[in-house]
Every structure is written in C-alpha cells, then in structure tokens.
Amino acid sequence: LHNMEIQAERIIDPRLKTQAVAIISSNHSNGSIISLSSEAKEEGLCRGMKVSLVRKMSHRTQLLPYNQLLYDRINQYVYKTVSSFTPVVEPYMLNEFFLDMAGMDSIYDNIKNVGFSIIKRIKDQISIDGTIGISNNKLVSQIVTAVIPDVVHKINRGHESQFLAPLNPKFLPTVRVKSIQRILKFLLIKQISHIQVIAEQSEEFKILFGIHAKTLSREAKGHDTSKVKSYRYRNHILEQRILPEDTNDKMILYAIVKDLSERISFKLRKR
C-alpha cells in the first residue's frame, strides 16, 4: 500500500488530494517527515527531513501529525481482507503483507487474477490503492512492488536474475550493510548485474565481501528461501511510541525503552 498514510489522510479530507502533504512525527522544529506525497517531493522535501527545514523550504506543504489509530485500523482491515484469500499471511510493515499462495492452485486458476481481486476489494471498501508483486519468493515479490508501477506484476520462476539485473543494488537487503555499501561505491557498481558477474568468481567474491558474500550472491540472483510466517496475535506483542521531537539523548531514549519493556513484560505476565 504505497504511501498509505497520505492516502488515508486524503480520504478523510478530500481537499488534500491536490496539495503537497507531509506526515510528521511532531510539530516541534526537531520533528521529522515520516511520509510525504509526490507533490511534497516536488517541493524538494524527503523522508527524515526536519520540520524546521521543511518550513523554510516549502510554505505550501500541509504538515499533518501521525495518526496512528487511523493507520492501524486500515492495516487491520487490509490484513483481514487478504487473509480471506489465503490462510498464510505475514504482515511485514504497516503497509506491506506477504501472502503464501502455495497449494492454492486447486482453488484459484490464475494467481494474477487473484491479485487483481485483492486490490479491487480493498479499493472498493476503503478507497486505498495498492500494488502486488508475484514471484517464487518474498525477496523478489517485495522488489517488484518497489520498482514496477503495474497494479499486479508477476515474475515467472527462473526469471528472477534477469529481472534484478538492471536494478540498483540498493534493493538487496545485504547492501544496507555499511561496509558493503562502501565496497560497491568504491568499485563503481551501479547495477545488480555487475554483482551477478563478480559472484561467478566465487573466491574473489568471498575476498571482497567476506561473511556477506554468500548471502549477497544469493540475493543478486533472486534466491530467497525464507518462508511466509503466519501472523499469531498471541505470539506478537507490539508497543511503540512516536516521540514529540527527535532526540539522541541516551537518558531519554533509555527511559522510553525501559517503559516499553515494562509494558510488554506486564502483558506477558497477564498471559
């Protein structure tokens, strides 16, 4: 569900549909952007930008507080909707879900049509748009939704490496490791295809990327064996807080983490 927060706010207030909108952690000058519309991006804004800088750069952008209750309710509705198509659903983030459709061939003749049905049902009920990526694994399906604008797009088994080849390495999870980023930048590697070629020389690849070599090589080829894990409410406790202002004060952060830990402990004891 791309930019779900922005979509939700525009449903609540249709006047926002053509305006530059940014969701912020707080109105304090030290708050930051959590989500923003395409119009806000055109104003030069980006995620993580401080509110103080936003106010200097753009006077047209509407700044809205993070409405956790609203977003959680939408997320729960979408979870229930996709769960009616398969019993194995894994919520990954607030606006992202993995569905395991293995063994569903006897029920659904065409998985792409199932994807369109899911998107249509969500759109009809709550007016939220989304995209679906279909592939043999979670990694490729997730990348599909990030780079392909189609409502539903499928990568056939065996075509994962070809699909990934022209893409920026930033889409591979292992590339988020700082040391890997530095190596790729030094080697001027700007496409996953370059990683695929280097990975063919296994010894040299291992020397370059060390303990991350095997994982990076698998990801570059579109291999992922991680399973979709069904959501279990009883085994999942979530406590979170949006700070009124960003801070690196260790004492404040420690106190918040301690408070969240105590809340979780209390819930566990009640079980």
What are these model-predicted stretches?
Residues 92-96, 135-138, 271:
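Short Gly/Ser/Thr- and Asp/Glu-enriched loop/turn motifs at secondary-structure junctions
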Residues 1-94, 98, 218:
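Residues that scaffold, gate, or flank divalent-cation-dependent active/transport sites
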Residues 99-103:
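Short beta-strand-to-loop capping motifs
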Residues 8-10, 34-36, 141-148, 227-232:
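Short acidic, glycine/serine/threonine-rich loops at helix termini
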